[in-house]
Amino acid sequence: MANDGWEQGWHERNGGNLSYRVKPEEVEEVKENFEAREWNPIGTAVPNLAGEYFLVTGSGKYFRNVTIKPEDSICMIELDEKGENYRIVWGLVNGGRPTSELPSHLMNLEVKKLQDERYRVVYHAHTTNVIALTFVLPLEDKV
């Protein structure tokens, strides 16, 4: 998904971010590669996501590099049992932190999980053509 967005020109430099709520069976498939780091506050509480894992882009990282150097561009995080803290368990090998939008992504994913378990992705892009339309079309909800 990150590479598709890059190839379509949806991301200027490090603009945009992505988060995916990982399925338990997918976590089991890769858990042997985890190396837990220190816990960090999320900045909000998402109790309905407690104990879950998420694949997220790194802050300031380029979508272009996700397929080239995934271990440096993205990370897998685990939430604690209260949904108040996270820790990186894989990725961002050269340092860094998850997207600065992590709290809002997790809050959205929590709402979507309560509505329908199938919703697992938050994708934020700066699509140039859509941005350009904001200068051409009237700024009305009905458009």
Sequence positions of predicted segments:
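Glycine-rich flexible loops
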Residues: M1-V143
